[in-house]
C-alpha cells in the first residue's frame, strides 16, 4: 500500500517542526510554531492495516494518530534557546566604518538572517562565510574610489568631473570579509573598521572628492592651480598639456604627488 499512501500524501499538507525564523515586521528572530499536517504516516498505516488483516476485518479506520506529526514542538527548550541566542548574536545593525568615522555600509538584521542557519541536530548557530564574502565584495565595489568618476565644486565655483588615475581608496576585501565574519560569529559587536590596501586623505563616499590639498590641472583652461587643504589658492600658472592625439594627450584622473 506504499504507492497508495504516497499518492494520497501528494495532495495533503505536510507537518513542520517548530523552528527559528526571522520576522521582518518585528525585525527580530522569533519562534515559528510547529504545523500539524494531513499526510499519512506510512509506518503507522501499514501497522494498522496489518492488525486489521490479522483480525479478518474488512475495513480499517485511520485517525489523526496515523498522521505524520512534527518532531519538534514549540515547548522544546532548545528552540526557545536558539531564538534567544540568534537575537543576542546580532544587534539592531552592524556598521562598516571607513577612515575611522565614516559609515560606508550597514548590515541590517534581514541581511544577517539570510546568512544564519540553525542545525536541526543540536540547534547550534552558524553563519555562512561565503554569504558574508559575497556581500562584502559587492559593497566594496561601491566603496573603492581608485579610478572612479568624481564630481566636486572647485574652490572658484567651477563644477568639475574627473575619472581615472591611481589615487584613492581601495578596500582589502579578503581582510574585510574575514573581519566581518569573525565579528558576527563572536556576537555583540556593532561595527568593524574597513581595512584598505590603499587610502586617500578623506572619504566622502564613492563619486565625491577624497583629497585635501591638491594641484588642479585644467586641460580645457590650460591652467594649474594649487589649493591647500582649507581651499586657499596658493599658486596659479599657465601650463601646456599634451597634444590631444593618440599617444600624446595628457591622461586625466587623480594621482598622488
Range-by-range predicted roles:
Residues 1-257:
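Surface-exposed, secretory/extracytoplasmic low-complexity segments enriched in Ser/Thr/Asn/Gly/Pro
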